[in-house]
Each structure stands twice: as structure tokens, then as C-alpha cells.
């Protein structure tokens, strides 16, 4: 797995100061995507244990309120690596994890390994970016078809629970 960027202090993807990992590789190739360079699965640098340790250390910073994982497409990576990462974040920091995916909730919950990952995630912004539905006033997403899902409540209730309906 490769990553496109790693930010210790990021205020552009979620509320507050978060540490953010941008994974490389995405087959969705949404028209109007702002991060086209990250479509390439070999873009950026190799993701290593040292990179993961650094990311965890960023999240542990007292000023950081959570972790963001986006891309690229996190659910098109080696899912064992993503699962290991989200487990480590929760076990070592207990801070919220926010993930973005071009897949919908309905697509993700059909795949066991994706559900294993979601068990550790707090928020999922789901759905492909749609240029004709782009809205620059949206806070955590790029187009109106995307949803901010409370993952833990959705898993518990067996239905999608939106954060900002």
C-alpha cells in the first residue's frame, strides 16, 4: 500500500484538529475529483510500520481530536492493513476515526472485511463524488449525494443513522 499524504494537524476534512492519512489508489475515478493524483495505487510513498507509528504518534498529540482516513479509496487497499490501522488508533488513542469512501454504506456492509473495519470507525462519509451535485458549502463532503453516517449507531440499529440529515 502507498500513501499520498500524511498530515499531523489538519482542519480541512473534519471539525477540529485531526491527523489525516491519504491513501493512494482509487478505481472510482469520479469526474471532478480534487485528488486525481491519488488514483494511482503507486502514487506517493510506501506505507510502512514506521509511517503507521508516526501517524499514531500524531493522533496521540493532545491538540488532535481525531483521525481522518481518506484517499484515494481506503476500501480498495489491502484491507488487512486498514483493519490493523483502525484497531491501533482505537486501542492506543481512543479518539474518533472518520473515513471517506466512494462506496455506499449498502455496498460496504455486504463485504465482511469492510464490516470488520467499520466496527472500529465512528463516522463514514459514503458515496462517490458527483460533479453535478457538488456543493462547496458542505462541511465534510463534496456533493449532496454523499452521507455522513454514524457508523456505530448504524451497526447497532441495523439501519443508516445520519449525523447531519
PLM regions and their residue ranges:
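Short Gly/Pro-enriched loop/turn and capping motifs at secondary-structure junctions
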Residues: 104-106, 129-133
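Conserved Radical SAM active-site core
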Residues: 1-4, 17, 35-99, 103-117
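P-loop/Walker A phosphate-binding loop and immediately adjacent motor/lid segment at beta-alpha junctions
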Residues: 77-86, 134-165
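Non-cysteine beta-strand/loop elements that form the S-adenosyl-L-methionine
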Residues: 120-130
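Short cysteine-rich clusters marking metal-coordination/redox-active sites
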Residues: 30
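A generic structural signal for alpha->beta connector loops
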Residues: 94, 120-121, 145
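N-terminal [4Fe-4S]-dependent radical SAM core
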Residues: 1-22, 27, 35-41, 160-161, ...
Amino acid at each position: 500500500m502507498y500513501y499520498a499524504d500524511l498530515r499531523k494537524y489538519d482542519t480541512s476534512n473534519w471539525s477540529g484538529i485531526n491527523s489525516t492519512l491519504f491513501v493512494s489508489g482509487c478505481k472510482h475515478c469520479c469526474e471532478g475529483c480534487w485528488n486525481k493524483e491519488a488514483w494511482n495505487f503507486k502514487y506517493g510513498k510506501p506505507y510502512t510500520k514506521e509511517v503507521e507509528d508516526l501517524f499514531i504518534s500524531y493522533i496521540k498529540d493532545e491538540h488532535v481530536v481525531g483521525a481522518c482516513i481518506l484517499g484515494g479509496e481506503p476500501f480498495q487497499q489491502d484491507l488487512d492493513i486498514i483493519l490493523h490501522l483502525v484497531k491501533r488508533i482505537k486501542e492506543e488513542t481512543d479518539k474518533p476515526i472518520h473515513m471517506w469512501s466512494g462506496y455506499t454504506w449498502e455496498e460496504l456492509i455486504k463485504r465482511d472485511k469492510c464490516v470488520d473495519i467499520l466496527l472500529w470507525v465512528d463516522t463514514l462519509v459514503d458515496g462517490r463524488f458527483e460533479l453535478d451535485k457538488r456543493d462547496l458549502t458542505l462541511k465534510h463532503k463534496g456533493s449532496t449525494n454523499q452521507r455522513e453516517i454514524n457508523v456505530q449507531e448504524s451497526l447497532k440499529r441495523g439501519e443508516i443513522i445520519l449525523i447531519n440529515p
